[in-house]
Amino acid sequence: MSKAFVAIHCETGKENPIIRKLMEIKGVSEVTGTLGLYDIIIKVEAADSMTLEKIITKEVRKIPNVLTTMTLMVI
């Protein structure tokens, strides 16, 4: 099982719609709104690192109004 935490910076005021979309993504196991440089932190889990990468790059980063992400792989 591969895991990562992803910090998400998004357009101001768009946090709640993004949080709702994130909760619909298979593999996203936790979603938390935060204050500071990043607006949302998520935990992503997948069977392997390749699947994990696809979830982050093809689904999370493609959500409208997501500006930047920082991925922290769990070792």
PLM features per residue range, with description:
Residues 1-75:
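A compositional/biophysical signature of low hydrophobicity enriched in polar/charged and small residues
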